[in-house]
From Swiss-Prot:
It catalyses: Endohydrolysis of (1->4)-beta-D-xylosidic linkages in xylans. This is Endo-1,4-beta-xylanase 4. Residues 19-210 form the GH11 domain. One of its GO terms (cellular component) is extracellular region. Its EC number is 3.2.1.8. Its main location: secreted. Endo-1,4-beta-xylanase involved in the hydrolysis of xylan, a major structural heterogeneous polysaccharide found in plant biomass representing the second most abundant polysaccharide in the biosphere, after cellulose.
Length: 211
């Protein structure tokens, strides 16, 4: 989730099967999905037609929650957003978040975060540059954990922005293409949202998705 002498490397390059080109799926619908996983742990409100949501939670959150707005079927389309996100002292993310059906994977493009960087404890895949910043890229395997199909074992992919921000355009295709070199299935998408996730601390977020 890893290179030999130069000559051996040349042989591997010469005889390895080509990496298939990723299939990039475009989004055809406006916002049509509300993500509300344990939103009752805080004050989650949203206006689907306006593309806005907010979440406030107090210190003492007892479990993980993920809330946001997006699309029932994900895509490689760019996502433009603006947010007011106060993450200090919380374990939380502001991220593009979604799932792939086969092979099952959970993914995050983390634009800002609180006191925990998920790549600090995962397997590094290197770095990539997108939208004015370097992103750390990493992967992890979750075993017998909650998923879109109940309890299952699946792969997680993370791109974590080094120059964090709370507004801008996320060129999703760059991240999908990078992950596809490491096993990410780039076509059979489940839902995709601009999300806030947290599991400790106190924080507030107000997010607008414009595309």
């Amino acid at each position: 989730m890893k290179v030999t002498a130069a000559f051996a490397g040349l042989l591997v390059t010469a005889f390895a099967p080509p990496v298939p080109e990723p299939v990039l799926v475009s989004r055809s619908a406006g916002i049509n999905y509300v993500q509300n996983y344990n939103g009752n742990l805080g004050d989650f409100t949203y206006d689907e037609s306006a593309g806005t949501f907010s979440m406030y939670w107090e210190d003492g959150v007892s479990s993980d929650f993920v809330v946001g707005l997006g699309w029932t079927t994900g895509s490689s389309n760019a996502i433009t957003y603006s947010a007011e996100y106060s993450a200090s002292g919380s374990s939380s993310y502001l991220a593009v978040y979604g799932w792939v059906n086969l092979s099952q994977a959970e993914y995050y493009i983390v634009e800002d975060y609180g006191d925990y960087n998920p790549c600090s404890s995962a397997t590094s895949l290197g770095t990539e540059y997108s939208d004015g910043s370097t992103y750390q890229v990493c992967t992890d395997t979750r075993t017998n954990e909650p998923s879109i199909t109940g309890t299952s074992t699946f792969t997680q992919y993370f791109s974590v922005r080094e120059s964090t921000r709370t507004s801008g355009t996320v060129t999703v295709a760059i991240h999908f293409n990078f992950w596809a070199q490491h096993g990410f299935g780039n076509s059979d998408f489940n839902y995709q949202v601009m999300a806030v996730e947290a599991w400790s601390g106190a924080c507030s977020a107000s997010v607008t998705i414009s595309s």
